[in-house]
Amino acid sequence: MCRCGPVILIALGANLVSPAGPPADTLKRALARLEALGVKILSVSSFYETRAWPDPSDPPFVNAVAAVQTTLQPVELLDLLHGVETEFGRMRSAPNAPRTLDIDLIDHDGSVMGGAVTLPHPRAAQRSFVLVPLAEIAPGWRHPVLGQGVGELLAALPNKGTPKKLA
C-alpha cells in the first residue's frame, strides 16, 4: 500500500507486442503492475499513436504519461520501472530500437539531479510524444530547469508529426 509522497511524472511507450499483448494493452497492464507494486496512479493521459523515430518504417508507438506517487527515491523508482520493463519483455538492444515497453521517469516533484538518474528527463522537452500527453494531465507543469511551461515547450518544437489521440 502506498504511503504516497511527491507527484511524479512517468512516460510510457511501446511499439512491439509484449507478453501482455499489443502496445495499448501493454501500457494498461504495466500501469496495473506498477499499482500492484505500490505505486499510486493519480491520473493517466489518453493513449497516443506516434510515428517511430529515427526509422519511420518501424511500427508506430503507443504513448501515454501518468502522474503517480510513491515514497521511493528517484534511483529506487527508476530501478522499479526498469524491472517492470523487463517483466514485459523489454530487451535493451540499441538506442531508439523498437520495444515492448519503455517507461521513463520525466519529473520527480521538480527535482533537478544528475548522476545515476537525470531529472528532469534530459530529452522530455524535445519530445512531442511526451509533451502532448503531459499537457493533457498536467497543463500547469513547468520544466524545472528551463522554467518553461508545457505549452511553451510544445510551441517551440519543430513539426515532426504530432501524436494522434487514440479512441
PLM regions and their residue ranges:
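Nucleotide and nucleotide-moiety/phosphate-recognizing core
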Residues: 2-10, 16-95, 100, 109-110
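Flexible, gly/pro- and Lys/Arg-enriched active-site loops
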Residues: 53-60, 78, 82-167
